[in-house]
Amino acid sequence: MNNRPFLLKPFPASAALPDLKISTNITRRFNTLIVQYNLTGPLEELVIPTLSDRPARKNNLWEETCLELFLGPDNSDHYWEFNLSPAGHWNIYHFRSYRKGIREEPAFTSLPFIVSRQEDTFQLSLEIGMDKIIPADQSLAVGVSAVIKSIYGELTCWALIHTGTEADFHRRDTFIIEL
C-alpha cells in the first residue's frame, strides 16, 4: 500500500481561479484504488451541482465540473477514463489507444462515491475495486485531473502536469503516478 498526495495545477492558458486549491490523495491497497479529491478556496465562485437523489451513468460530464482519473496498465496502449460529477453522476470509458476505440466500460454498472461540502471545502472520495478490469499484479500509470466550471461559465482544466500546448488529460505522459 502506498499513500500518495498530489496537488493539481491549472492549465497555463486557462482563466485560473487563483485562490482555488485542488489536492488529491491516491492509494492502491491490493487491487483497490482509493482516491480522494479536495477542493479548497472560494467555492462560491464554482459551479458545484448538488448531490442527485438518483446518481446515474452519464456522458459528457466534463462539460461541467468533473473530477477525472486515468488508469493505464504499464507496457500497454489501452487505458480507462473515470468521470465523476459532484452530483454523483459518473462514467467509465475504455480506450484501445490514445483517444481511439472509446467505449463505455461494461464491467461497472455503478460507481458509488462520497461527496461532502462545507463553506470553503468540497471533498469527493472513491474506492474502486479493480478486479473486474486489471489484475492485482499489474502496475499502473495514473493521471488525475479535473474540469472546474466557474459561475461565469468558464471551464478550467487542472492536472498533475500539462505537457502539451492544449489541455489534454489523455496524453500518456501525464499519467505520472506509478502504482
Range-by-range predicted roles:
Residues M1-S52, K58-N60, A159-L179:
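Order/disorder boundary and secretion-linked terminal/linker segments
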Residues I22-R28, T109-R117:
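Short amphipathic beta-strand and strand-loop transition segments with alternating hydrophobic
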Residues P55-T109:
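Extracellular/luminal beta-rich ligand-recognition
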Residues F113-M130:
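Surface-exposed extracytoplasmic segments
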